[in-house]
Amino acid sequence: MKNKNKRLLVMAGGTGGHVFPGLAVAKQLQSEGWEIRWLGTADRMEADLVPKHGIEIDFIKVKGLRGQGLKKLIAAPFQILGAISQAKKHIKAWQPDVVLGMGGYVSGPGGIAAWLSGIPVVLHEQNAVAGLTNQWLSKIAKRVFQAFPGAFPNAEVVGNPVREDVCQLPHPKERFAQRTGPIRLLVMGGSQGARILNTTLPEALPQLSHEIEIWHQAGKGSQETVEQAYRDNGIADAKVTEFIDNVAEAYAWADLLVCRSGALTVSEVSAAGVGSIFIPFMHKDRQQALNADHLVQCGAAQMIEQQDLTVQGLVDTLNGLERKQLLDMACNARDAAIIDADVRVANAIKSLAK
């Protein structure tokens, strides 16, 4: 007898940019009585993260093809066929009503397996440039969503699903109302940190013409090095952490953010309402630069391409930002936010469930 509750299988893995938006959609549907299961790989972050959110996960064996040697490329078709077969077994055993692909290597075999099994596939592309897996799957998906314009020519722009505590932060006008004293600068390079931020910021910040308070996420294994870099440049009170567990608290604290422009970061700072200086990672397809572009265009952020980043240039940029301008940037960021992406994607999934 078929289970009375609707079931969603989420395919996402590899990075937080794929996994966290998938979790946001999953939680939305769980609140409406849906059962959720996950398809991932055993050696990536989803293996630990997803079960912590109370969601069972199945694994398939699959790796990316970029940068592989000739022998591995020759073997790749057999690996992909094996991964599709594994995914089909998991799908047959659990019988989801809909499959949601959020990106990562696992989505390719999982999406094909769902299509072969007659299960409708919904895709969400987090970046302004579509990943290779989603480019392929878009041809067989029932619905395709994109966070930013341009990833697909005809897909609906819904933003990225962002964690609820970020979306619920008070408006920038309320947060900034009583702030005086040093400008609060939050530096984030992602969970792995960003070497160029870890080296440039400690050198640039002592040269500013105004006081500043610093919270710097250095990334795994870099905390002591970055702390020492600040001390070497005369700043003894910088708060340096490997990770920021409560990112909503950090956004609420900050007057300005200096960071990479990964898709989820761009969506989060917009939802939070924080002005930003983006230093995009140098992808050959300029993915991160294109992610940030819409916030730059609406006056919510400035962007310095990594190849153009210098200590003096960063000093000049930061010196040019006063509290009034920071508030304007924060308000523009909030105005540009799409904070119901999880609901929009969830509604599409519900419409496809038989």
From Swiss-Prot:
Residues that coordinate or bind UDP-N-acetyl-alpha-D-glucosamine: 15-17, 127, 163, 191, 244, 263-268, 288
Pfam (any one): Glyco_transf_28
Record pathway: Cell wall biogenesis; peptidoglycan biosynthesis
Catalytic activity: di-trans,octa-cis-undecaprenyl diphospho-N-acetyl-alpha-D-muramoyl-L-alanyl-D-glutamyl-meso-2,6-diaminopimeloyl-D-alanyl-D-alanine + UDP-N-acetyl-alpha-D-glucosamine = di-trans,octa-cis-undecaprenyl diphospho-[N-acetyl-alpha-D-glucosaminyl-(1->4)]-N-acetyl-alpha-D-muramoyl-L-alanyl-D-glutamyl-meso-2,6-diaminopimeloyl-D-alanyl-D-alanine + UDP + H(+)
Gene3D superfamilies hit by this protein: Glycogen Phosphorylase B
The keyword Transferase belongs to this UniProt entry's keyword annotation: yes
Keywords assigned by UniProt, alphabetized: Cell cycle, Cell division, Cell inner membrane, Cell membrane, Cell shape, Cell wall biogenesis/degradation, Glycosyltransferase, Membrane, Peptidoglycan synthesis, Transferase
Top-rank lineage group of the source organism: Bacteria
Location relative to the cell: Cell inner membrane
Chief site of localization: membrane
Membrane-topology annotation of the record: Peripheral membrane protein
Record function comment: Cell wall formation. Catalyzes the transfer of a GlcNAc subunit on undecaprenyl-pyrophosphoryl-MurNAc-pentapeptide (lipid intermediate I) to form undecaprenyl-pyrophosphoryl-MurNAc-(pentapeptide)GlcNAc (lipid intermediate II).
GO biological process per UniProt: carbohydrate metabolic process; cell division; cell wall organization; lipid glycosylation; peptidoglycan biosynthetic process; regulation of cell shape
Molecular-function GO terms, alphabetical: UDP-N-acetyl-D-glucosamine:N-acetylmuramoyl-L-alanyl-D-glutamyl-meso-2,6-diaminopimelyl-D-alanyl-D-alanine-diphosphoundecaprenol 4-beta-N-acetylglucosaminlytransferase activity; undecaprenyldiphospho-muramoylpentapeptide beta-N-acetylglucosaminyltransferase activity
E.C. no: 2.4.1.227
The name this protein goes by in its record: UDP-N-acetylglucosamine--N-acetylmuramyl-(pentapeptide) pyrophosphoryl-undecaprenol N-acetylglucosamine transferase
UniProt xrefs under InterPro entries: GlcNAc_MurG, Glyco_trans_28_C, GlycoTrans_28_N
Family: Belongs to the glycosyltransferase 28 family. MurG subfamily.
Organism in which the protein naturally occurs: Aliivibrio fischeri (strain MJ11)
GO CC terms, sorted: plasma membrane
PANTHER family xref list: GLYCOSYLTRANSFERASE (PTHR21015:SF22), UDP-N-ACETYLGLUCOSAMINE--N-ACETYLMURAMYL-(PENTAPEPTIDE) PYROPHOSPHORYL-UNDECAPRENOL N-ACETYLGLUCOSAMINE TRANSFERASE 1 (PTHR21015)
